[in-house]
C-alpha cells in the first residue's frame, strides 16, 4: 500500500510523507482557492451582500473577516497551531485580506507539514463540546472554508464578474485556466 501511495503522489506531482499528508495537501490547495476567489473581488465589492435588506447573508467583507477569524480560532484552540499574528489585517481592503490570510495560512501549512506523526493527527482534542481527532477537525475546517468560498463565487456572479477557474475548469471559463491572484488591481 505504501508503494502504491508513493506512486500515486508522485504521479500527481506532490509527495506525501505521512498517512495524513492528503489533508495537508487539501488544505494547501484550499487556501490557494480562497486567495484566488478573494483576488477576483474589487474593494468596492466588499459591502455587497446577497440581498441588500437581508443581513443574514454576510457581505463580502464579513465573509473575509469570518474566514480569517474562524480559521485562526480553529487552528489555535483545536489544533494547537498559533501563527502569532492577529487574524485580521490592519488595512481591511481586498489586498489587505489577501496578504494577511496568505501569510497566516502559509504559516499554518508549514506547521501542518511538520506533523508527520500519525499519533498527532489521531489524538482526540476538544471540538467545541465534543472530542474529535485532529484529522477530523481539519476535514471540518476545509469543508467550512469550501462552503464560504462557494458563497463568495455566487456573489461574484451576482456582481456580473468573471469567475476564473481556481482549480481546474469552470462553466465560466470553458477551459483550464490557473488563476493567479493579482494584488495590483
What are the functions of these language-model segments?
Residues 42, 113-116, 156:
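A structural signal for long alpha-helical coiled-coils and helix-turn connectors
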Residues 13, 24, 28-35, 46-89, ...:
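Short, contiguous alpha-helical
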Residues 113-128:
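Acidic catalytic patch
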Residues 1-17:
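N-terminal amphipathic/basic-hydrophobic helices that include classical n-h-c signal peptides
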Residues 27, 31, 38, 101, ...:
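Hydrophobic alpha-helical core bundles mediating ligand binding, dimerization, or RNAP-core interactions
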Residues 77, 81-115:
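Helix-adjacent hinge/juxtasegments
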Residues 19-24, 94-98, 139-142:
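Active-site rim elements
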Amino acid at each position: 500500500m505504501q508503494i502504491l501511495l508513493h506512486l500515486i503522489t508522485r504521479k500527481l506531482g506532490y509527495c506525501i510523507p505521512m498517512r495524513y499528508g492528503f489533508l495537508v495537501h487539501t488544505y494547501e490547495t484550499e487556501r490557494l482557492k480562497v486567495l484566488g476567489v478573494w483576488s477576483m473581488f474589487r474593494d468596492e465589492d466588499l459591502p455587497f451582500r446577497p440581498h441588500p435588506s437581508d443581513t443574514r447573508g454576510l457581505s463580502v467583507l464579513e465573509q473575509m473577516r469570518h474566514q480569517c477569524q474562524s480559521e485562526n480560532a480553529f487552528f489555535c484552540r483545536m489544533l494547537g497551531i498559533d501563527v502569532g499574528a492577529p487574524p485580521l489585517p490592519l488595512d481591511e481592503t481586498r489586498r489587505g485580506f489577501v496578504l494577511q490570510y496568505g501569510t497566516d495560512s502559509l504559516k499554518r501549512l508549514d506547521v501542518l507539514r511538520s506533523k508527520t506523526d500519525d499519533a498527532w493527527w489521531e489524538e482526540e482534542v476538544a471540538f467545541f463540546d465534543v472530542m474529535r481527532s485532529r484529522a477530523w477537525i481539519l476535514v471540518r475546517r476545509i469543508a467550512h472554508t469550501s462552503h464560504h468560498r462557494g458563497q463568495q463565487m455566487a456573489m461574484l456572479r451576482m456582481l456580473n464578474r468573471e469567475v476564473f477557474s481556481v482549480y481546474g475548469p469552470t462553466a465560466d471559463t470553458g477551459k483550464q485556466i490557473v488563476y493567479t491572484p493579482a494584488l495590483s488591481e
